[in-house]
Amino acid sequence: RVREIKKLVNAGKYFMINRARQYGKTTTLRALYRNMMKDYYVVSLDFQTFGSAEFETESRFANSFADSILEEFERRHREFPKKMEESLENLRRKISERPLNENFTLRSLFGYLGDLCASADKPIVIMIDEVDSASNNQVFLDFLAQLRAQYIDRDIQPAFQSVILAGVYDVKNLKRKLRPEEEHKYNSPWNIAAEFTVDMSFSKEEIAGMLEEYEADYHTGMNINDMAQWLYNYTSGYPFLVSRLCQLMDERI
């Protein structure tokens, strides 16, 4: 599954992983992060950590997003080429201005991010989890529009290698969640996204593999093939249900 998703990243795709809650999206992103670290600078963000105030104005969001980017680079990536360090320092200096720079727009932010991409010695991949937390905000849609513009112009301007959004809803369908009088605001800012067709559910074989590991430790004598088939039939491979049923059988039966 991670290998399939990485193929999209290697191909430079921007895409959305939208699945029901507890479908393994966050776990998959973490596994993908570990898998890509050697080849890319991977920046992993979570919009659940952004407060509602950070989506109130464009400048607040731009400052918060830039700050999160810098924190990720400082925490997970220790050494950078000189030009890249200069780009990071320029962005750091910009968001350190006090009082808060109300003229720091998304367009300005993406100018700094473009400089960062140009100076990096490895391509940069952005992963953003829980984008549903931001989906009712106009600032978020403006942010998507900037990503779209960056993607379209990347043959002439530096851009992220790949952008991965994760959440319950497909951001292409945000219009459905908004009041009719606001519909004029939306023009499919994420229509550049590649279709995400990777199956996130467990196959019967994957369930059997987990049961084999359990059987090797506990020697229950179960028929692994039959049990895997039963679990798959009952859950359709929904990761949370598979894990929960296995937990209940382990603890209560």
Task: List the predicted regions and their residue ranges.
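N-terminal pre-P-loop "Q-motif" helix
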Residues: R1-K6
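P-loop NTPase nucleotide-binding core
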Residues: K7-Y23, T27-F143, Q161, Y169-V171
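Non-catalytic alpha-helical coupling and interface elements of nucleotide-dependent molecular machines
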Residues: A66-E74, I152, Q247-E251
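The catalytic "switch" region of P-loop NTPases
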Residues: P123, S133-A228, N233-Y234, L248-R252
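The conserved phosphate-sensing helix
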Residues: T235-Q247
